[in-house]
Amino acid sequence: MPSRKSLLSACLAMLTAACATVPDALPPLELAPHVDLHRFMGDWYVIASIPTIFEDGVHNAKDTYELMPDGTIATTFTFNADAPDGPIKHYKSVGFVLAPDSNAVWGQQYLWPFKADYRISYVSPDYDVTVIARAKRDHVWIMARSPSMSDAQLARLTAFVAAQGYDTTKLKRVPQHVIP
């Protein structure tokens, strides 16, 4: 019968080997050179995304950012669940700027102590459209200040997302219904 010490050593060796086996590293994401946080604040409508499991079936999705006095960013994700007139849902989180030289890399905290990777990969000069990405290339959001975007502009941003290493066949258009 193996001793506790040998079992612990074997487990430690397997854990070390698992950590040492890293898949091919992805190249760094392109980031917005500088994000003016005051201009970035406000409402952003999600036009298309490679969604998280929590975003399946959303309509009228919108992120709202508010810069707080302590430098954190209060974030509210609002949407209608499962239908254009479905129940309104809200998720709140707190953003933390992790790269103050550019303000383009944030940690987004939905549950303490975990911070999700959140990178402003692109923001237009007029702060009208943005692309939010993640280093893992698992999720991405194309957002705009208004709930609509031309097909040509969406195609340009989709090409940008593809150039960042994303599988754009997973990109889904988010239904935005303007309700008077």
Task: Please state what every model-predicted region is.
Residues 9-17:
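Bacterial N-terminal signal peptides
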Residues 1-8:
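Bacterial N-terminal signal peptides that target proteins for export
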Residues 19-180:
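A beta-rich soluble binding module of mature secreted/lumenal proteins
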